Amino acid sequence: MKILAAVSMAQLIVHVATARKAIRDQVPYDTPFGHGKPENVARDMWNPTLGSGMAAPWPWLAAQAVGTLALFGKAPSWVGKAMGLLGCSYIYGYLSERSVRASFRHPDMKTTPLTVLGTILSIAMALSGLARRERPSGTR
């Protein structure tokens, strides 16, 4: 679980950096299911279903932070699975955002590294959380 914890921590750091950039540059969420307004980005980050055009909302990041801290300790196995599912939702979120897809098509040095790294770490988080084998009781 320590590898998952480290990947999740790195992903959380990238997410906070992209959230900061999205708020500063007023990048609203823009998915096939809805569109935000640039002036509402900071407010939308507090809505658990919205977020910004570059980051998940604060409640999701708070849940990830709690799960990550639990993984560094003795967490039940369901925490790893939950973090894997969170990684899957981040993959979907990243790829559904117009600003992220645009940064892949037209790379720039400020946005693309964050979006690529966030997507890769989300994939790693999903794989390491969901591909874990359960150990039989009494074994190390």
Question: Across the structure, where does each feature detected by a protein language model lie?
Answer:
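Short amphipathic, positively biased membrane-proximal segments
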Residues: 1-140
